[in-house]
Amino acid sequence: MAATLGPLGSWQQWRRCLSARDGSRMLLLLLLLGSGQGPQQVGAGQTFEYLKREHSLSKPYQGVGTGSSSLWNLMGNAMVMTQYIRLTPDMQSKQGALWNRVPCFLRDWELQVHFKIHGQGKKNLHGDGLAIWYTKDRMQPGPVFGNMDKFVGLGVFVDTYPNEEKQQERVFPYISAMVNNGSLSYDHERDGRPTELGGCTAIVRNLHYDTFLVIRYVKRHLTIMMDIDGKHEWRDCIEVPGVRLPRGYYFGTSSITGDLSDNHDVISLKLFELTVERTPEEEKLHRDVFLPSVDNMKLPEMTAPLPPLSGLALFLIVFFSLVFSVFAIVIGIILYNKWQEQSRKRFY
């Protein structure tokens, strides 16, 4: 279902207008603050958005590097170019990633990804795609679109090559999403079908206009939309209620090539904090969680980690363990002496 960009009343139009230029965004925000209006409302239910620059990235990519002041780190074959960050070039056996150094503690958020996938390969002779991550671990290379398998968190995959030979009902490129608590492996042979939350076809390769992906997480409701037709409108792709994601994870994006390849470029990543009104009942229901999960979807080993013991608790455990050990030894000695005394009486 398309969300047409009409007047500035719709939240989609507002976001697109603000995303055009960071300078105009800041100027507009300052004018709004100066007039006492604050950030613009972007939807029903009193929802407002704020750009979080510590979790965002755009040209000229000054926050990318290895220094202590850098907000983003590159990994593998990823390179900073003038107009984009190239995760992988159109060459075989390459992988690269871009990771935010700052953990995200936002409760409700929206990530807008401006990307481009292109290359020389003809139909079905290109790959493999890219992924957008919100995970507990960062900078961990692996086989899942350049990231580690059995990750903890959320992965959104733009898969450009079908590995499953017998699949016919699915047209690639294909966008899918997966929530993992560290117990599941991504099934490459079946293109991730056993663990996906949903997906949609997305013809995003070798296009001559901008392509965008939006990941929205509000009130434990995950929504993924795309703007890939050059019409400046969002199309729904995935919508999943009951998604529980812990706070304090990292945003990143990665890509990998094998025998087939493509250029996988990221132009910008922009994260918005969404302020959403909650009822008292929703406040109770939406408490922080320790492990990612999805309601009505059973994941193996869904056991929350025990909180670490405090110093006092550890001392008391050791102390009482020693007392119990000494007590057991004393009782053992007393019983042994009584047994020996009874044995001597029988002997005489």
UniProtKB/Swiss-Prot annotation:
InterPro entries: ConA-like_dom_sf, Intracellular_Lectin-GPT, Lectin_leg. Residues 49-274 form the L-type lectin-like domain. A carbohydrate binds at S93, D128, Y161, P162, N163, H188, G258, D259, L260. The chain crosses the membrane at residues 314-336. It is found in: Endoplasmic reticulum membrane; Golgi apparatus membrane. Residues 337-348 are cytoplasmic. It is linked to Intellectual developmental disorder, autosomal recessive 52: A disorder characterized by significantly below average general intellectual functioning associated with impairments in adaptive behavior and manifested during the developmental period. MRT52 clinical features include global developmental delay, severe intellectual disability with poor speech, and mild seizures in early childhood. This is VIP36-like protein. It comes from Homo sapiens (Human). The gene is LMAN2L.
